[in-house]
Every structure is written in C-alpha cells, then in structure tokens.
Amino acid sequence: ETTGATFNFDFWRTCEPRRSTYPACRAVIAAGLQTLDARRAMYDAIQNAYFLDARNPSLSEELISISGEIGLDSTLFADDLGSNEVASRFAAERQACRNFGVTGFPTLIWSWQSADDEDASPRYGLLAAGYTNLDTLLSRWRSLMN
C-alpha cells in the first residue's frame, strides 16, 4: 500500500543531501516572527521545494528565496534566520519535544485549551510516536479529552 505522494527524485541527482533538518526548522520559526500564519506557509513551501522541486532546504539561500516566494520580507527573514531569538525558540521547541519523549517522526501531539478558562495555559498530550493505527490514535485522543 502506498500513499500516492508525489516525489521528484531529481533531488538525489542535483542536490547534496544533508542530514540535518535544523535549518528548515529554524526557517519555520523565523517565518512565524513575521506572521503566525507564515509558519504553516513556510512549512508547506519547504515541503514542496524539497519533494516536488528538488530544492535543498538545508541551504540558507534556498530558505531565504522561499521566504520571498511566500510573500515574506526576505531581508528581515534572512536576519531572523540566524538570530539569537530564533536559536532560543528552536532550542525551547526541541526541549519541549524531549519532554514528550519524541525521538523521531512521525509524532503527533495534541494541544487543547479549556473552553471554560480562556486564560489557562494550553495542555498537551502525546497521541502518536511512530506509526499508530487509527483505532489506537482515536482511543488516545478520547482519553486526553476526558
């Protein structure tokens, strides 16, 4: 069984693969400094650049180019990409992952907030670490909601 996902295999012929996704992760955070919606837009654009366009999301120049393509201020993005603020936020997000026991992908963490208390901090729960069938996923989600 396959997902039907499209993948441009030219990446392996035209790019020098790197083993780190950290630059792409920092790019998502840097995009989010401009607008919250930009985090998702950058994530989607990086996925398309890698899987469909055979572009290397480990390269800062590619990430800066992508930022302009999705309508961000690419000069500001370039500054933010290497900033202490982005490094600090990325470190905090990695620590949060370690706190959940995340060691790989795919991982699904559910975030929710009480409708009765808008000032309460969001709560988080681990739904899946690695492949999880739908029945198990739904069971875990229901237990978090109770």
Please place each PLM-identified region on the residue numbering:
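C-terminal cap of thioredoxin/glutaredoxin-like
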Residues: 45-146
